[in-house]
Regions:
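HhH-family (HhH-GPD) DNA N-glycosylase catalytic core used in base-excision repair
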Residues: 1-202
């Protein structure tokens, strides 16, 4: 059984909120709420790629800097970035200066444009991979799933980079493709209700 922690407001939250004070707001207003906006979906999968090998606290602290540096994750604009932009970004101390991850985000922006042409939207594509709830029987006990493995494989086949199964699973958790809030977390039933009323794209 996954654990919860009781915050200063008396609410039970997922235990990972205890790792940093800024996590409470992120947990309460973003994590796990279903997202069908293409730009937000693209931003999140890029930031999950940047997180690889690092903590989410590091990425969250730099998120506004990332948005400023990466054209607010408008993938149509980011797809036009060139080698000069890569070199500029490598000098930006406000972000994670990792050439491979920077180049992957630009590459993925181009692949996102292609995906919209083929699929209609990023949301229509990603939500096709919404798993059956039974796949995650006990919340927060897995770092990958059969669906995250399948989605990762398909993205790589389409030319996306830094989209391994663990990265993709974290993306699915955060974007509400699954409800992975802990049993006992005050938000778990709310997320269930939001997911029930969500009109799936595509």
């Amino acid at each position: 059984m996954s654990k919860t922690v009781t915050g200063p407001d008396g609410k039970c939250r997922c235990a990972w909120c205890d790792a940093a004070p800024e996590f409470n707001a992120y947990h309460d207003t973003e994590w796990g709420f279903p997202v069908i906006d293409d730009q937000r979906l693209f931003e999140k999968i890029c930031l999950e790629g940047f997180q690889s090998g690092l903590s989410w606290r590091t990425i969250l602290a730099k998120r506004e800097n990332f948005r400023a540096a990466f054209a607010d994750f408008d993938f149509r604009k980011l797809a036009k970035f060139d080698e000069k932009d890569v070199e500029r970004l490598l000098q930006d101390a406000g972000i994670i200066r990792h050439r491979g991850k920077i180049e992957a985000s630009i590459n993925n922006a181009k692949r996102a444009c292609e995906m919209v042409e083929r699929e209609g939207s990023l949301a229509a594509y990603f939500w096709r991979f919404e798993p059956d709830p039974s796949e995650i029987a006990i919340p927060q006990t897995k770092s990958t799933s059969p669906t995250s493995v399948a989605l990762s494989k398909d993205l790589k086949k389409r030319g996306w980079k830094f989209v391994g199964p663990t990265t993709v699973f974290a993306f699915m958790q955060a974007m509400g493709l699954i409800n992975d809030h802990a049993e006992g977390c005050f938000l778990r039933p709310k997320i269930d209700e939001v997911r029930k009323s969500l009109v799936r794209p595509g």
